[in-house]
Amino acid sequence: MKELKQAEQIRTWVQSILTDESSGHDWHHVSRVADLAAYIGEKEKADLFIVETAALVHDLIDVKLPDTVRLSVSEVYDQLVFFGVGKENADRVIHIITRMSFRDRGKLAKEPLSIEGKAVQDADRLDAIGAVGIARAFMFAGAKGHGLYGDEQSAYAHFFHKLLRLKDMMNTDTARELAEERHNFMLQFVRQLEKDIPGIDAETS
């Protein structure tokens, strides 16, 4: 009962911060990731309170958020302690969210994620692929002023730099199964885009 109340407080807090975010790292994304992470975590026998908490706060420190929205690691930690999750649990959550980003993957060679961290990372990556991943890719490009194609910062280039690589980077068997259909849909979309815009690959490379 205590953890349920804490989770609800954290949800309300995170939602108040991310409601107006427009780059695809908004409250809807976080809510989907939390649901996916809980599903994966249950299948993988993880600590579901840690999974849900880490999923809810995972984007608050992301550099892709505007400075006016993004929080520091210490601010997130202090708020979790304020909600009563305890310093040990707060430490576990911080360990996850500071190592799960695509750009942080080098850290994992030295300090692999816990099963809770793997569940959250997989959920975040699943939300970056498939139909919702395609939609988010264009939301992000639009928010940052990047084009559809034509250079290395374009939405089209992002599929090759990151999104089409994520299927093979899933940690858990559960996520690997879920990723297959999403990856194939995304690949089909990219191939159709290349048919619709002849030479798009040459213009982007």
Swiss-Prot record:
InterPro entries: HD/PDEase_dom (IPR003607), HD_domain (IPR006674)
Top-rank lineage group of the source organism: Bacteria
CDD domains linked: HDc
PROSITE patterns: HD
Limits of the HD domain: 26-129
Pfam families: HD
Alphabetized PANTHER family for the sequence: HD_PDEASE DOMAIN-CONTAINING PROTEIN, SUPERFAMILY HYDROLASE, PUTATIVE (AFU_ORTHOLOGUE AFUA_1G03035)-RELATED
Protein name according to UniProt: Uncharacterized protein YpgQ
UniProt gene name: ypgQ
